[in-house]
Amino acid sequence: MPKPQQVITWRDKTPDGFRFLPKINQMISHMRRLNNAEMLTEEYCDSIIQFEEKLGMVFLQLHDNFGPKNFDLLANYVEKFPKAIPLAVELRNTEWFNNESVFSKAYQLFETEGVTNILVDTAGRRDLLHMRLTTPNAFIWYVGANYSESD
């Protein structure tokens, strides 16, 4: 977890117009799985807010086994996340995309809360390209792995 002074140092070393898109610490996303993560999230946000005008969007990459059964944890987390900090979420578990009602419920949550859905372009997972925008901003995650023929 970066300390506020470290964030200030990074901010001050970058040119005007530069934007940081920091990933939420894995202690929150993977170890706590968004459960009882309020204090850690507050500490994280207190640090990254020091990016000031250079803060682009914060992204939450969920564990690949964080599926729809954890919807309530996800909803609680994004509903409480500070609205002054733009948030994007990457749903990695395929169960989010296999059922239209689950898919719609997750995206409705994101649209309601102003959370950007991360669009993922991953070799071997072209099925994920069906995802939709949930805010006016696009966050596209290009993931390369051993450069498959489809890349």
Protein language model annotation of sequence segments:
Residues 1-151:
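Residues lining hydrophobic/aromatic ligand-binding pockets adjacent to catalytic sites
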